[in-house]
Design a protein with these regions (language model features):
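Beta-alpha-beta core module
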Residues: 82-88, 92, 151-202
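Secondary-structure junction motif
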Residues: 104-105, 118-140, 203-211, 221
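Flexible hinge/capping segments at coil-to-helix
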Residues: 81-120, 205-208
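Short, small-residue-biased leader/transition segments that mark boundaries at the very start
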Residues: 1-6
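Short loop->beta-strand "edge-of-pocket" segments that line small-molecule binding or catalytic clefts
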Residues: 23-25, 94, 110-130, 218
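Short, well-ordered beta-strand segments
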Residues: 21-25, 73, 97, 121, ...
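Central regulatory/effector-binding core of bacterial HTH transcription factors
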Residues: 17-81, 150
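Hydrophobic hinge/microswitch elements
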Residues: 57-70, 76, 126-180
Length: 223
Protein backbone atom coordinates (compact mmCIF):
# COMPACT_ATOMS: atom_id res chain seq x y z
CA UNK A 1 0.00 0.00 0.00
CA UNK A 2 0.89 3.69 0.02
CA UNK A 3 2.16 3.29 3.59
CA UNK A 4 5.24 1.57 2.22
CA UNK A 5 6.37 4.71 0.38
CA UNK A 6 6.78 6.56 3.66
CA UNK A 7 8.92 3.90 5.30
CA UNK A 8 11.97 2.23 3.80
CA UNK A 9 11.74 -1.29 2.46
CA UNK A 10 14.77 -3.36 3.51
CA UNK A 11 16.22 -3.23 0.00
CA UNK A 12 15.86 0.55 -0.27
CA UNK A 13 17.39 1.66 3.03
CA UNK A 14 20.98 2.77 2.59
CA UNK A 15 22.50 4.15 5.80
CA UNK A 16 25.22 5.91 3.83
CA UNK A 17 22.76 8.14 1.98
CA UNK A 18 19.69 8.10 4.26
CA UNK A 19 18.66 11.37 5.94
CA UNK A 20 16.31 9.61 8.33
CA UNK A 21 15.77 10.90 11.84
CA UNK A 22 15.35 8.19 14.49
CA UNK A 23 13.41 9.03 17.64
CA UNK A 24 14.20 7.10 20.80
CA UNK A 25 12.99 7.20 24.39
CA UNK A 26 15.91 6.06 26.51
CA UNK A 27 16.01 7.63 29.97
CA UNK A 28 19.01 9.19 31.69
CA UNK A 29 21.17 6.13 32.32
CA UNK A 30 20.52 4.41 28.99
CA UNK A 31 21.42 7.63 27.17
CA UNK A 32 24.81 7.53 28.85
CA UNK A 33 25.25 3.86 28.00
CA UNK A 34 24.39 3.89 24.32
CA UNK A 35 24.24 7.33 22.70
CA UNK A 36 28.04 7.82 22.51
CA UNK A 37 28.42 4.42 20.78
CA UNK A 38 25.49 5.03 18.41
CA UNK A 39 26.70 8.49 17.39
CA UNK A 40 30.27 7.29 16.84
CA UNK A 41 28.97 4.58 14.46
CA UNK A 42 26.66 7.01 12.67
CA UNK A 43 29.41 9.60 12.35
CA UNK A 44 31.75 7.04 10.81
CA UNK A 45 29.35 5.62 8.25
CA UNK A 46 26.03 7.42 7.91
CA UNK A 47 26.63 11.11 8.43
CA UNK A 48 23.14 12.26 7.36
CA UNK A 49 21.22 10.17 9.86
CA UNK A 50 20.14 12.02 13.00
CA UNK A 51 18.87 10.79 16.36
CA UNK A 52 16.58 12.34 18.95
CA UNK A 53 16.17 11.08 22.50
CA UNK A 54 12.95 12.09 24.26
CA UNK A 55 11.34 11.50 27.63
CA UNK A 56 7.94 9.83 27.43
CA UNK A 57 5.64 8.78 30.25
CA UNK A 58 5.11 5.02 30.24
CA UNK A 59 1.40 5.59 29.58
CA UNK A 60 2.21 7.43 26.31
CA UNK A 61 4.83 5.06 24.91
CA UNK A 62 2.61 2.72 22.90
CA UNK A 63 0.71 5.58 21.26
CA UNK A 64 3.98 7.33 20.38
CA UNK A 65 5.33 4.12 18.81
CA UNK A 66 2.07 3.55 16.91
CA UNK A 67 2.07 7.09 15.47
CA UNK A 68 5.77 7.07 14.54
CA UNK A 69 6.54 9.78 17.09
CA UNK A 70 8.94 7.21 18.50
CA UNK A 71 10.88 4.44 16.77
CA UNK A 72 12.16 2.69 19.90
CA UNK A 73 11.76 2.74 23.66
CA UNK A 74 14.25 1.33 26.14
CA UNK A 75 12.69 0.71 29.54
CA UNK A 76 12.81 -1.73 32.48
CA UNK A 77 9.06 -2.25 32.10
CA UNK A 78 7.40 -3.62 28.94
CA UNK A 79 4.08 -1.87 28.23
CA UNK A 80 1.03 -4.14 28.13
CA UNK A 81 -0.03 -4.12 24.51
CA UNK A 82 -0.30 -6.65 21.72
CA UNK A 83 0.87 -3.98 19.24
CA UNK A 84 4.46 -4.14 20.40
CA UNK A 85 7.41 -6.51 20.56
CA UNK A 86 10.39 -6.37 22.88
CA UNK A 87 13.79 -7.89 23.50
CA UNK A 88 16.00 -7.79 26.59
CA UNK A 89 19.10 -5.75 25.74
CA UNK A 90 20.79 -5.18 29.07
CA UNK A 91 21.08 -6.58 32.56
CA UNK A 92 22.91 -4.84 35.36
CA UNK A 93 23.41 -5.60 39.02
CA UNK A 94 23.94 -3.24 41.94
CA UNK A 95 27.19 -2.42 43.72
CA UNK A 96 28.24 0.24 46.22
CA UNK A 97 30.75 2.75 44.83
CA UNK A 98 33.06 5.21 46.57
CA UNK A 99 36.15 7.37 46.07
CA UNK A 100 39.75 6.10 45.84
CA UNK A 101 41.12 5.50 49.35
CA UNK A 102 37.67 5.37 50.98
CA UNK A 103 37.29 3.42 54.26
CA UNK A 104 35.22 0.78 52.44
CA UNK A 105 38.15 0.06 50.12
CA UNK A 106 40.15 -1.15 53.14
CA UNK A 107 37.59 -3.80 54.17
CA UNK A 108 38.04 -7.25 52.65
CA UNK A 109 34.44 -8.51 52.74
CA UNK A 110 32.14 -5.52 52.95
CA UNK A 111 29.00 -6.29 54.99
CA UNK A 112 25.57 -4.68 54.79
CA UNK A 113 26.36 -2.97 58.13
CA UNK A 114 29.60 -1.56 56.70
CA UNK A 115 27.63 -0.09 53.81
CA UNK A 116 24.92 1.33 56.06
CA UNK A 117 27.50 2.95 58.36
CA UNK A 118 28.25 5.28 55.44
CA UNK A 119 26.44 8.41 54.37
CA UNK A 120 24.74 7.88 51.02
CA UNK A 121 24.11 9.76 47.82
CA UNK A 122 20.68 8.93 46.44
CA UNK A 123 19.76 9.67 42.83
CA UNK A 124 16.08 9.78 41.95
CA UNK A 125 14.02 11.96 39.65
CA UNK A 126 10.78 10.81 41.22
CA UNK A 127 9.56 12.88 44.09
CA UNK A 128 9.10 9.92 46.40
CA UNK A 129 10.73 7.21 44.35
CA UNK A 130 11.63 4.29 46.58
CA UNK A 131 14.63 2.61 45.07
CA UNK A 132 14.72 -1.14 44.45
CA UNK A 133 17.57 -1.23 46.95
CA UNK A 134 15.62 0.54 49.71
CA UNK A 135 12.76 -1.90 49.26
CA UNK A 136 15.17 -4.83 49.77
CA UNK A 137 16.81 -3.14 52.76
CA UNK A 138 13.45 -2.49 54.41
CA UNK A 139 12.58 -6.18 54.15
CA UNK A 140 15.44 -6.94 56.52
CA UNK A 141 14.80 -3.91 58.72
CA UNK A 142 17.58 -1.65 57.44
CA UNK A 143 17.57 1.94 56.23
CA UNK A 144 20.33 3.95 54.63
CA UNK A 145 21.24 7.44 55.72
CA UNK A 146 20.92 9.75 52.72
CA UNK A 147 23.14 12.82 53.02
CA UNK A 148 22.36 14.10 49.53
CA UNK A 149 19.48 13.36 47.24
CA UNK A 150 19.87 14.62 43.68
CA UNK A 151 17.93 14.17 40.46
CA UNK A 152 20.59 13.24 37.92
CA UNK A 153 23.31 10.62 37.68
CA UNK A 154 25.46 13.09 35.74
CA UNK A 155 26.86 14.78 38.86
CA UNK A 156 27.13 11.61 40.96
CA UNK A 157 30.75 10.71 40.02
CA UNK A 158 32.04 14.20 40.92
CA UNK A 159 30.32 14.06 44.31
CA UNK A 160 31.53 10.53 45.04
CA UNK A 161 35.12 11.40 44.04
CA UNK A 162 35.23 14.54 46.21
CA UNK A 163 33.43 13.37 49.39
CA UNK A 164 33.05 10.30 51.61
CA UNK A 165 29.51 9.66 50.37
CA UNK A 166 28.84 6.27 48.79
CA UNK A 167 26.42 5.44 45.98
CA UNK A 168 24.48 2.24 45.49
CA UNK A 169 24.13 1.99 41.74
CA UNK A 170 24.79 -0.27 38.80
CA UNK A 171 28.07 -2.02 38.10
CA UNK A 172 28.21 -0.61 34.56
CA UNK A 173 27.89 2.93 35.95
CA UNK A 174 30.81 2.32 38.32
CA UNK A 175 32.90 0.84 35.49
CA UNK A 176 32.09 3.61 33.05
CA UNK A 177 33.04 6.30 35.56
CA UNK A 178 36.11 4.47 36.90
CA UNK A 179 34.73 4.43 40.44
CA UNK A 180 35.99 1.77 42.86
CA UNK A 181 33.17 -0.40 44.20
CA UNK A 182 32.29 -3.33 46.45
CA UNK A 183 29.69 -6.05 46.05
CA UNK A 184 26.51 -5.66 48.10
CA UNK A 185 25.95 -8.89 50.07
CA UNK A 186 22.18 -8.80 49.56
CA UNK A 187 19.87 -10.51 47.12
CA UNK A 188 18.84 -7.46 45.11
CA UNK A 189 17.08 -8.19 41.80
CA UNK A 190 19.19 -7.00 38.88
CA UNK A 191 17.97 -4.23 36.59
CA UNK A 192 16.77 -5.43 33.21
CA UNK A 193 16.27 -3.16 30.22
CA UNK A 194 14.10 -3.99 27.23
CA UNK A 195 14.15 -2.61 23.71
CA UNK A 196 10.52 -2.00 22.71
CA UNK A 197 9.12 -1.30 19.24
CA UNK A 198 5.86 -1.37 17.27
CA UNK A 199 5.06 -4.50 15.26
CA UNK A 200 4.16 -2.40 12.20
CA UNK A 201 7.78 -1.25 11.93
CA UNK A 202 9.16 -4.75 11.50
CA UNK A 203 10.48 -5.38 8.01
CA UNK A 204 11.31 -1.70 7.57
CA UNK A 205 14.96 -1.42 6.48
CA UNK A 206 15.82 1.62 8.57
CA UNK A 207 14.15 0.09 11.61
CA UNK A 208 16.13 -3.15 11.23
CA UNK A 209 19.37 -1.17 10.87
CA UNK A 210 18.73 1.02 13.93
CA UNK A 211 17.59 -1.92 16.07
CA UNK A 212 20.84 -3.74 15.30
CA UNK A 213 22.84 -0.62 16.21
CA UNK A 214 21.04 -0.19 19.56
CA UNK A 215 21.50 -3.88 20.44
CA UNK A 216 25.22 -3.64 19.63
CA UNK A 217 25.53 -0.45 21.69
CA UNK A 218 24.09 -2.22 24.76
CA UNK A 219 26.37 -5.25 24.22
CA UNK A 220 29.31 -2.86 24.15
CA UNK A 221 28.10 -1.21 27.39
CA UNK A 222 27.72 -4.58 29.10
CA UNK A 223 31.45 -5.22 28.95
Amino acid sequence: GSEMCIRDRPDTFDPKSSKRNFKLSLGDVSEGRVLPFIMKEIYADSKNISVGSFAYQRSDQVHALATNNLDFVVDPIIPRSDEINSEKVFEDDFVVMYREGHDLSKIKDVSVDDILDQKHLHVSNRRRGLHLIDTELEKIGYRREVALRCQHFLIAPTIIQSTDLVLMGTRSFANRNNLPFAEIPLDIPSMEYFLIWHKNDEGDGGHIWMKDLIVRAFKHAQR
